[in-house]
């Protein structure tokens, strides 16, 4: 049963960046971790999926790769890796500091993601911060990878919109079903 005093839910969402419309969402209890929702999404070959670092799971990312789809995700932690190809430090062209092909060193990580992945370190001048991205897309430029990740912000704007405009400040019932119905109606 959901609590009436504190919103204990999560809305796991897959948004089409081109239309800014959710193509999938699932409402769960707040205890369900984001990474579990990766198993619920439908992945299409050649499509690109951009994830927050809370979704960093090498085995699941490898499954996306095996399905012929692309992923972009921010680095979580400092996984040990070896450089297969690429420069350790670039001249900062287009604010790209590193563009490397890497292989994970730890046996556990190699088992989860046995392939080669691309590691990009990008300086975002508007935020005065450096970001590290992992992707299996070796076709797009490093700058385009960083730009696609920046578009992930549309998900955050979607949730901000929900909170501001859908008036789901208090749930009308305490049961899980009541909360789900209220959120579904608000989104529709």
Task: Report each predicted region and the residues it spans.
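Single, function-defining residue in the core of a domain
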Residues: 2-188
């Amino acid at each position: 049963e959901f609590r009436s005093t504190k919103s204990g839910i999560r809305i796991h969402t897959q948004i089409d960046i081109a239309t800014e419309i959710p193509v999938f969402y699932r409402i769960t209890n707040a205890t369900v971790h984001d990474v579990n929702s990766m198993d619920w999404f439908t992945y299409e070959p050649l499509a690109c999926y951009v994830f927050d670092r809370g979704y960093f799971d090498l085995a699941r990312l490898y499954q996306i790769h095996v399905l012929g789809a692309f992923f972009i995700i921010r680095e979580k932690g400092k996984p040990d890796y070896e450089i297969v190809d690429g420069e350790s430090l670039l001249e900062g062209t287009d604010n790209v500091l590193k563009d490397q092909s890497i292989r994970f060193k730890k046996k556990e990580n190699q088992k989860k993601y046995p392939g080669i992945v691309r590691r990009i370190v990008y300086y975002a001048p508007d935020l005065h911060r450096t970001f590290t991205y992992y992707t299996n897309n070796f076709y797009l430029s490093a700058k385009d990878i960083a730009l696609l990740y920046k578009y992930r912000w549309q998900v955050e704007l979607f949730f901000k919109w929900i909170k501001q405009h859908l008036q789901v400040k208090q749930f009308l019932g305490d049961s899980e079903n009541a909360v789900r119905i209220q959120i579904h109606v608000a989104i529709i």
